[in-house]
């Protein structure tokens, strides 16, 4: 399937598809979550012995509750230490000793190797894919920021938005459900739920083919097409604004 000329949106859909394939392949093979790898990458490249927890929350787009849980795991395995400020106990800091930094460096090197090996096997031709852990971190945060933009300005999930982008890119605006599932790189139940939500809100039409009832068609009428194009243009403009760019490391 070809996407339309909304370049920024197309880039993010490509990145999201890459991340989906990466997580699916790598997750069963490593003894650490991707988020924990990313957190260690962040701490390693900060090159600070002590970091306020508030700064980590500000820099990374993860939920604070998620970060708390992952930090607990890293503390448990002695990658980092957690200390409270003597001045104000409400302020928490992450502390890293030289020994811990060496241990973190080994994990970051492993993450670099995992990314390179996956890229070699994946054979993606996109220039957007990350070459190492630092680029992976930036792209992950950028895509999460993108999802926040969609949720805030359009009140749509990323899956719902991706479906709209794919359908509007088709010449006749007709997509088979089977083809959509193969293209979107999200789990089947999640995709079907998003489709049903879009149909309920009047964004698209979902119906069985009159020629073959086993086939489910997804398409839009002219008004729905115009509305979707306006939404895509709005998001593309937001993404084109460099003030909205969220990169942890330049």
Swiss-Prot record:
Name of one Pfam family that matches: Staph_reg_Sar_Rot
Native source species: Staphylococcus aureus (strain NCTC 8325 / PS 47)
Role: Transcriptional regulator that controls expression of some virulence factors in a cell density-dependent manner. Acts as an activator of the gene encoding protein A (spa). Negatively regulates the expression of alpha-hemolysin (hla).
Induction of its expression: Expressed at the early exponential growth phase, decreases through exponential phase and reaches a steady-state level at post-exponential phase. Repressed by MgrA and SarA. Activated by Rot and SarT. Transcription is also dependent on SigA and SigB factors. Is activated by SigB in strains harboring an intact sigB operon (rsbU, rsbV, rsbW, and sigB).
InterPro entries: HTH_MarR-typ, MarR/SlyA-like, SarA/Rot_dom, Transc_reg_Sar_Rot_HTH, WH-like_DNA-bd_sf, WH_DNA-bd_sf
Gene name per UniProt: sarS
One Gene Ontology CC term in the entry: cytoplasm
Transmembrane segment boundaries: none
SMART domains per UniProt: HTH_MARR
Superkingdom of the source species: Bacteria
Record's miscellaneous remark: Mutational analysis of the spa promoter suggests that SarS might stimulate spa transcription by competing with SarA. The regulatory events observed in strain NCTC 8325 are not representative of the events that occur in clinical isolates of S.aureus.
DNA-binding region positions on the chain: 53-76, 177-200
Predominant location category: cytoplasm
MF annotations from Gene Ontology: DNA binding; DNA-binding transcription factor activity
Protein name per UniProt: HTH-type transcriptional regulator SarS
Annotated keywords: Activator, Cytoplasm, DNA-binding, Repeat, Repressor, Transcription, Transcription regulation, Virulence
Protein family (similarity comment): Belongs to the SarA family.
Localization terms from the record: Cytoplasm
Gene Ontology process terms (BP): regulation of DNA-templated transcription; response to stress
